[in-house]
């Protein structure tokens, strides 16, 4: 009897345990775990647990790749820091991998791959290089093939790297404060092909840097929003296109270990949007799906229209490539989220100081396909151009009212409602010039998001061949007066059409695409489509005479003389009429600075002919080198002409600021110590320092002449052809202009001459002491210094 009772007890115990286990297992189902939670259905279902402030993520696609993108919907507002509204962060191809009760978010290594149908060959490459596990999730519940994870910590972390960005900018040591951070549900949404999650993060620090103190209301607590996008990757219908250095289309680079031994292992594919003809056989066809860009509705008029118009110029280039109505620009709908990857965006971004605009993209790292174009345009750019214009041509009477009307807010013509006035584009209208610049800037940054790189040679041919150059305002001189009528161009240029054709042209069915692309390239180079980009234009010792930033014209030396004359005329008429009534006179300095240095970029362009080397990104073709003109040292006479033009800018009469202007600029007015204005270096504070201003202008000429790379080239080119000047000849000319000419009789001019002499010696000493300079360069510089003793 006891034995029977014991057996019965054991059976009942087992049954109860099984029942409890079954109930527990039922409780671990997704349905049970998410009961009462708000569900956001879509690509990856989300569940919002309002009571606990948690966000749960449902996963059913394992080992299936998708795109993970981080961005910054709100910014800090300081350009030097670089955390701007709308800024894109890292773009990663990732997948979920489950092991038991853990789910890993894995980033595969697409820099090294094997493009082959052999799975074992692909596996060998995958296992040879490390991958990255970005996050690990604990399974909260499961149901069939689906699992539920708590993604709160994943989304609430500093994924954009705000802490590290602040540290690199020397703005203090911050850390994420979870107690002051939360999900931003208004921008947390789900769609069939993308899941969007936004958070509000607060970073705290005890010793914030100056830039943080200037822009954040409570500098010890910096709050921004961070956005996460989980996006389905494009389907397999996209066809990559090879990168060619003869045309400036950016791309992705990777190593293909399955390539034949006779072929390069390095592969380069261009970045471009997916664009297909509706009728592939037609010369010009509507697209299957157009490329649509949306303009930030926060941009005011007339800026908004300028942004739309400038970006719309690209439709002309797409028409030249065989597409009709393929590129469109619209205003972002009020209910649309600009961080949604489905929208190509043109963002209007405010900062405390002026700074760069950007054209960036969300790209598929596997193919180079552009999924989202994202433009960031700094709002202070238009004000800077207005400052330049009103500094060159006085728009006010000496009493303070604008010529032809009453006094008004200086930027009223830009941000007021007088649309008819803004479209007049008169020869002296700084506002019209500023809006024209915004059109061009919109086109330029959108061009980057279409895949195009900078072309810093484009300003030298075909009357502004590309919007992808940096444009200086083309200020003309008509009847002795400055004229803004042609300050900035309209529309894309010949090079832009050439580049878009290479990137997007779709050839007739059955055509040999590689042969068609080569034919297109050879035709473009034959028509003079010269492309030279950043690496060959920006360095202080850059050699290409035609690759320059903020320059104009085919002849850099002639344009330097022109810009010096523009500067002379501007200074001759500079005075009270350059500022509106009610403005402190000390603010004249902010307008004087860009006028006084008006020639600086053209000077940098002209000096590149000294020790200059013309070259192209030529490649070998079946017919030989293309372009046929591979490289050519700038002619000796041309080098000397450029040198003389550069040295002319060092004459005291070129550096002096007229005393009548100095008399108008008192120390900084009370209440105007801060602001966005930019001013000269000053060693005579609080008084304006004309000697320091002259030193700054002189250094623009002296520094590049003694730059070590340029100096070494001069010696090398002289060895190849003694007719070319060597570095010693450049030094002799520099010293002759700054030290050996008779001292000016005027005391003011003489003081400037002495400042230039001192600067010359300082720069010579820098070069002589530069351990990276060639021995011959250091020796020549040392010899010159000794001769001055």
Give residue spans per PLM region.
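Positively charged n-region of N-terminal signal peptides that target proteins for export
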Residues: 1-4
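Zn2+-dependent metallopeptidase catalytic core
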Residues: 64, 298-326
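Bacterial N-terminal signal peptides
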Residues: 7-16
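Conserved catalytic/binding loops enriched for acidic/polar residues
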Residues: 428-429, 433, 459-789
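Auxiliary tRNA-acceptor-end handling modules of aminoacyl-tRNA synthetases
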Residues: 24-299, 317, 331-429
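Sec-exported extracytoplasmic/periplasmic mature domains
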Residues: 312-323, 351, 447-448, 452, ...
């Amino acid at each position: 009897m006891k034995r029977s009772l014991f057996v019965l007890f054991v059976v009942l115990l087992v049954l109860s345990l099984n029942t409890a286990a079954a109930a527990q297992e039922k409780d671990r189902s997704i349905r049970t775990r998410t009961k009462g939670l708000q569900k956001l259905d879509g690509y990856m279902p989300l569940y919002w647990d309002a009571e606990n402030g948690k966000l749960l993520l449902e996963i059913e696609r394992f080992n299936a790749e998708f795109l993970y993108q981080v961005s910054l919907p709100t910014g800090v507002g300081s350009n030097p820091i670089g955390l701007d509204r709308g800024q894109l962060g890292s773009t990663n191809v990732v997948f979920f991998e489950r092991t038991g009760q853990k789910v890993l978010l894995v980033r595969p290594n697409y820099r090294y791959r094997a493009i082959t149908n052999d799975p074992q060959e692909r596996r060998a490459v995958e296992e040879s290089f490390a991958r990255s596990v970005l996050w690990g999730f604990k399974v909260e519940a499961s149901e069939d093939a689906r699992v539920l994870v708590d993604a709160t910590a994943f989304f609430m972390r500093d994924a954009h790297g705000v802490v590290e960005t602040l540290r690199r900018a020397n703005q203090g040591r911050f850390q994420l404060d979870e107690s002051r951070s939360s999900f931003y549900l208004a921008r947390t949404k789900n769609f069939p092909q993308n899941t969007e999650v936004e958070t509000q993060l607060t970073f705290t620090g005890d010793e914030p840097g100056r830039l943080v103190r200037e822009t954040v209301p409570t500098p010890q607590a910096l709050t921004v929003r961070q956005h996460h996008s989980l996006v389905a990757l494009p389907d397999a219908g996209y066809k990559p296109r090879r990168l060619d250095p003869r045309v400036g289309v950016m791309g992705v680079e990777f190593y293909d270990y399955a390539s034949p031994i006779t072929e390069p292992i390095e592969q380069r594919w261009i970045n471009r949007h997916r664009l297909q003809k509706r009728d592939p056989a037609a010369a010009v066809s509507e697209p299957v799906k157009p490329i649509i860009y949306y303009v930030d509705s926060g941009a005011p008029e007339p800026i908004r229209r300028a942004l739309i118009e400038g970006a719309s110029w690209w439709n002309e280039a797409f028409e030249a490539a065989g597409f009709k109505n393929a590129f469109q620009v619209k205003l972002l709908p009020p209910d649309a989220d600009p961080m949604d990857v489905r929208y190509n965006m043109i963002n209007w971004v405010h900062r405390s100081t002026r700074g760069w605009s950007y054209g960036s993209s969300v790209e598929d790292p596997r193919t180079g396909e552009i999924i989202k174009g994202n433009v960031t345009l700094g709002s202070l750019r238009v004000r800077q151009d207005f400052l330049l214009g009103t500094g060159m041509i006085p728009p006010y009477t000496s009493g303070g009212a604008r010529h032809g009307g009453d006094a008004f807010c200086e930027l009223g013509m830009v941000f007021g409602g007088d649309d008819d006035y803004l479209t007049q584009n008169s020869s002296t209208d700084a506002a019209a010039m500023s809006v024209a610049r915004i059109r061009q800037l919109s086109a330029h940054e959108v061009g980057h998001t279409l895949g195009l790189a900078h072309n810093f040679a484009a300003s030298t041919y075909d009357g502004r061949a590309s919007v992808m150059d940096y444009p200086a305002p083309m200020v003309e001189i008509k009847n002795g007066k400055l004229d803004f009528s042609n300050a900035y161009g309209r529309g894309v240029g010949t090079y832009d059409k050439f580049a878009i054709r290479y990137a997007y042209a779709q050839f007739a069915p059955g055509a040999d695409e590689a042969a068609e692309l080569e034919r297109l390239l050879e035709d473009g180079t034959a028509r003079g489509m010269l492309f030279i980009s950043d690496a060959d234009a920006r360095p202080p010792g850059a050699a290409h005479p035609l690759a320059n930033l903020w320059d104009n014209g085919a002849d850099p030396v002639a344009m330097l003389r022109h810009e010096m004359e523009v500067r002379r005329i501007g200074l001759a008429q500079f005075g009270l009429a350059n500022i509106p009534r009610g403005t402190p006179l000390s603010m004249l300095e902010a307008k004087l600075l860009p006028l006084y240095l008006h020639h600086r970029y053209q000077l940098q362009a002209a000096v590149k002919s000294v020790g200059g080397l013309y070259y192209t990104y030529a490649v070998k073709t079946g017919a030989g080198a293309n372009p046929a003109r591979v490289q050519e040292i700038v002619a000796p006479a041309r080098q000397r002409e450029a040198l003389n033009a550069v040295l002319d800018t060092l004459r005291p009469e070129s550096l002096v600021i007229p005393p009548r202007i100095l008399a108008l600029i008192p120390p900084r007015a009370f209440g105007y110590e801060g602001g966005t204005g930019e001013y000269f270096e000053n060693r005579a504070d609080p008084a304006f320092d004309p000697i320091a201003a002259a030193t700054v202008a002189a250094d623009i000429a002296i520094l590049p002449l003694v730059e070590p790379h340029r100096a070494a080239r001069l010696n090398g080119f002289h060895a190849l052809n003694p007719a070319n000047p060597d570095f010693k000849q450049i030094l002799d000319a520099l010293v002759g202009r700054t030290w050996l000419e008779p001292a000016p009789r005027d005391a003011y001019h003489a003081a400037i001459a002495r400042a230039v002499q001192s600067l010359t010696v300082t720069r010579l000493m820098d070069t002589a002491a530069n351990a990276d300079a060639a021995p011959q360069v250091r020796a020549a510089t040392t010899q010159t210094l000794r001769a001055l003793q």
